[in-house]
Amino acid sequence: INKQIKFLISNLNLKNDTFVHRDFHVSNLMKYKKKLATIDTQDALIGNRAYDLASLIDDVRFKSNKKLKDRIYNYYAKLNNKKINKVTLLNDFEILSVLRNMKIIGIFTRLAIRDNKTKYLKLIPYSWKLIELRIKNNEIFHNLKSLLDLNFPKKIRNLK
């Protein structure tokens, strides 16, 4: 799996050249004076512009349907169509979403085992669904999908 993660990272195309919140999801957004504001920015850095988009759209804490996910993605892509190639954006978005959700599964599992914080375990099946959503139609994930299917059968992932 590590080899596949390195392969995916090597296939990111966008430069690390923009502010990235790194924890950009609905719970860290607030309305302030009729504007949208972010909180919890201590982990921000310069990174890939698709990272926060993946964090927001494929947020494990906020279940949304594919139609809404596509609307948000398409809105962002349209706003940035002169700056970013569509194929490049989608590639990086899907890779970062998959890697982020794999990391989330690991963190939530560690919290349960090490710290006895089991409340996050209920979110893991949705993380798997988000991973599945992104890898099912993209050939770049073929080997990773095979490894995940071999090591984490759908029964374990709670996917039906």
Positions of the model-derived regions?
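ATP-dependent phospho-/nucleotidyl transfer catalytic cores
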Residues: 1-22, 30-33, 37-39, 59, ...
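Activation of the activation-loop gatekeeper triad in protein kinase-fold domains
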Residues: 40-44
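Active-site activation/catalytic loop segments of kinase-like enzymes and analogous catalytic loops
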Residues: 49-84, 98-115, 127-134
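ATP/Mg2+ or Mg2+-diphosphate-binding catalytic cores
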Residues: 106-160
